[in-house]
A protein has these predicted regions:
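Short, well-ordered beta-strand elements
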Residues: 105-107, 231-233, 244, 310-314, ...
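Mid-domain, small-residue-enriched loop/turn segments at the edges of structured enzyme/sensor domains
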Residues: 45, 99-173, 181, 317-366
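Beta-lactamase-like hydrolase cores
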Residues: 17-66, 86, 124-128
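C-terminal soluble interaction/assembly domains
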Residues: 332, 346-436
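Active-site SXXK
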Residues: 56, 70-88, 167, 258-263, ...
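Short, Gly/Ser/Thr-enriched beta-strand-loop segments that form substrate-interacting elements
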Residues: 201-223, 283-289, 399-429
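A small/polar active-site loop signature that marks catalytic segments
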Residues: 208-382
């Protein structure tokens, strides 16, 4: 019981109680959780569902059927669907093809393609051809809609709203490394990958005072769909090195320009770069094979990576319905929830795979029903292995539930005004428990 109570201190810290409520479950636990809810004196709406996975019966319920925004708890559905439709050993392929005097970089939706991976492809190509007239970019494995339904139009350059493409690299972001310069001079800012695809203007200032600082900002001209970055504001002269990530516009062209620069580094000259769907008579020059999907799934859940979630969804659509778009992928997810988890999907709304959209609506009971189904499924262990553990490094619960970490595996979720936690508690008293 101790572990469930500590868990619900977390839940009610971001929620409040109605003045009068009727709930169900274990009498002892109900009294203690209700007392925590009442004493919180906060003012938000909440839904709670705790279900014993031994008996299938509720241990505690409060507004459990109320539809609320799940935020990144949507990734629970996405992860399970990827394991079901694609499999833990699914691989993403990025190909370089040859056609006459041209080369084609063909994306396969790899969410974890790195700059190093791209450079290895460039090196392999440089050993097989002497020159390239045009580098064509083929991202047609998935559709060209960059942003999900209901994503806020003014998210701007933030990393969590990176555009989605079958040709993605470095999370479709630039990493800026910021540290103070000499007093009165600009901050020292380096960025990776170092590419001519972006422009960069540094108007920051290093100062000796540590109060009333003008916040240092790195912005992109996102409203005009450009990759012109500017740095403004102040930095204290004793500040530590910091890393800031910002997304880029047109990830396909970003990946293509990077690849062109790498090919040139390895001795090739390329005259043009443009987008084009590959024809059938092209020969393969080089291929990058991703790590197994389970590795990307772990990254999805522990880092709450939105790009990975949406690439999973579109790839599910491509493999299951032959159309690599959000509708096909989400229809597949809803079908899985309805047919396998026996959830009435007409009573929920799934607008994307990551939970960024505020159009998503799910109840706590739907989430615990889903978690109960996964617990009995063939990929139970794989799914649970991807979930962050309390107090475990490199996960979204790294600073939470440190003492109880061995008993809790759960996914966080957060938007402005929204905070969620769903997963499993392995309780010495109640046995395995699903909660949301």
């Amino acid at each position: 019981m101790k572990y469930l109570l500590i868990l619900f201190v977390l839940l009610v810290s971001c929620s409040t109680h109605p003045r009068l409520f009727s709930n169900e479950g274990s009498l002892i636990l109900k009294k203690k959780i209700n007392r925590l809810i009442v004493s919180s004196e906060l003012g938000a709406t909440m839904g709670i569902s705790i279900v014993s996975l031994k008996t299938g019966k509720p241990i505690y319920e409060l507004n459990s059927e109320k539809l609320l925004m799940p935020a990144s708890n949507n990734k629970l559905f996405t992860c399970a669907a990827a394991l079901d439709f694609l499999g833990k050993d699914f691989f993403f392929f990025t190909n370089v093809l040859a056609q006459n005097e041209n080369a084609i970089l063909q994306g396969g939706g790899d969410p974890d393609l790195t700059v190093k991976d791209l450079d290895s492809l460039a090196y392999a190509v440089s050993k097989k051809v002497d020159s390239i007239d045009t580098l064509f970019l083929d991202d047609t494995f998935l559709d060209s809609v960059y942003f999900g339904n209901g994503w806020m139009w003014d998210e701007g350059p933030w990393w969590y709203a990176a555009p989605i493409s079958a040709l993605s690299v470095n999370d479709n972001c630039i990493d800026f490394y910021v540290q103070p310069g000499k007093e009165g001079q600009n901050a020292i800012i380096n960025y990776f990958p170092n590419t001519k695809y972006i422009s960069f203007q540094n108007q920051s200032l290093t100062v000796s005072r540590n109060t009333n600082l003008k916040k240092l900002k790195i912005d992109r001209d996102w409203s005009d769909k450009k990759n012109n970055f500017s740095v403004t504001g102040e930095i204290f002269y004793k500040e530590e090195l910091d890393t800031l990530r910002r997304n880029i516009h047109d990830p396909t062209m970003f990946t293509g320009v990077l690849f062109k620069e790498m090919l040139e580094k390895h001795g090739l000259e390329i005259n043009y770069v443009m987008k084009k769907k590959v024809s059938r008579n092209a020969d393969t020059l080089a291929t990058h094979k991703s790590l197994p999907l389970i590795k990307s799934a772990s990254n999805l859940m522990n880092e709450s990576d939105n790009l990975t979630a949406e690439l999973f969804i579109k790839t599910i659509g491509r493999n299951n319905i032959t159309q690599g778009n959000w509708k096909s992928g989400l229809d597949s997810v809803k079908s899985l929830l309805a047919s396998s988890a026996l959830i009435d999907t007409s009573q929920m709304r799934i607008a994307d795979g990551s939970g960024v959209s505020r159009y998503n609506l799910t109840s706590a009971k739907q989430l615990t029903t889903f978690l109960g189904w996964v617990y009995e499924s063939q990929y139970k262990n794989d799914f649970i292995s991807t979930l962050p553990g309390g107090g475990k490094r490199n996960g979204t619960l790294e600073r939470r539930l440190k003492t109880e970490g061995n008993y809790v595996k759960a996914k966080t979720g957060g938007l402005s005004g929204v905070s969620n936690l769903s997963g499993y508690v392995f309780s010495p008293r109640y046995g395995p428990v699903a909660f949301s």
